[in-house]
């Protein structure tokens, strides 16, 4: 077993509750996250997600289109959000992915938004296979798009 972590952060000129509400509404990811091409699943995709929500995200990474079946695992309102692949989902070489969002208030009207993705892979995964899951430019583009969307309102 092997794992690797991608982490990025950005300062957004909005309070933590605004950033939290936006990014935990998974239907907002379409058109904001560069790899997200669609979201399907349980009722509640168009409002703040709650623990136990399951949904399927269609992802396109450089022409490789696949679906991930996510489940919201943990949350602390306006502070922390975590979702991961259920244990019955396997997408070689990755057998588990955990994504966390941390919302760190800076004063009254700014938030440090930190996104971390941990991928657990088979020991024999090649560097090329891992690269598709560790594209930090894509993660940074997502945070920049969240910032742009929230700060224009």
UniProtKB/Swiss-Prot annotation:
Per the record, the pathway is: Secondary metabolite biosynthesis
Query: Hey, what's the signal peptide range on this chain?
Result: none
* InterPro entries with a match to the protein in the record: START-like_dom_sf
Which top-level group of life is the source organism from? Answer: Eukaryota
What functional role does this protein have? Answer: Part of the gene cluster that mediates the biosynthesis of the indole diterpenes penitrems. The geranylgeranyl diphosphate (GGPP) synthase ptmG catalyzes the first step in penitrem biosynthesis via conversion of farnesyl pyrophosphate and isopentyl pyrophosphate into geranylgeranyl pyrophosphate (GGPP). Condensation of indole-3-glycerol phosphate with GGPP by the prenyl transferase ptmC then forms 3-geranylgeranylindole (3-GGI). Epoxidation by the FAD-dependent monooxygenase ptmM leads to a epoxidized-GGI that is substrate of the terpene cyclase ptmB for cyclization to yield paspaline.
Name of protein: Penitrem biosynthesis cluster 1 protein I
Which organism is this protein's natural source?
Answer: Penicillium ochrochloron
């Amino acid at each position: 077993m092997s794992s690797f972590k991608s982490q990025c952060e950005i300062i957004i000129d909005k309070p933590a509750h605004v950033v939290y509400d936006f990014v935990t509404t998974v239907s907002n990811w379409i058109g904001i996250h560069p790899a997200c091409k669609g979201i399907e699943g349980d009722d509640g995709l168009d409002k703040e997600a709650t623990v136990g929500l399951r949904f399927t995200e269609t992802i396109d990474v450089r022409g490789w289109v696949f679906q991930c079946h996510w489940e919201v695992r943990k949350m602390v309102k306006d502070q922390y959000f975590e979702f991961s692949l259920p244990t019955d989902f396997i997408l070689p070489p990755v057998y588990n992915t955990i994504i966390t969002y941390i919302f760190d208030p800076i004063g009254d009207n700014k938030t440090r938004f930190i996104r971390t993705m941990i991928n657990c892979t088979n020991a024999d995964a090649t560097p090329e296979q891992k690269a598709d899951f560790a594209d930090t430019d894509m993660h940074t583009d997502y945070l920049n798009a969240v910032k742009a969307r929230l700060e224009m309102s």
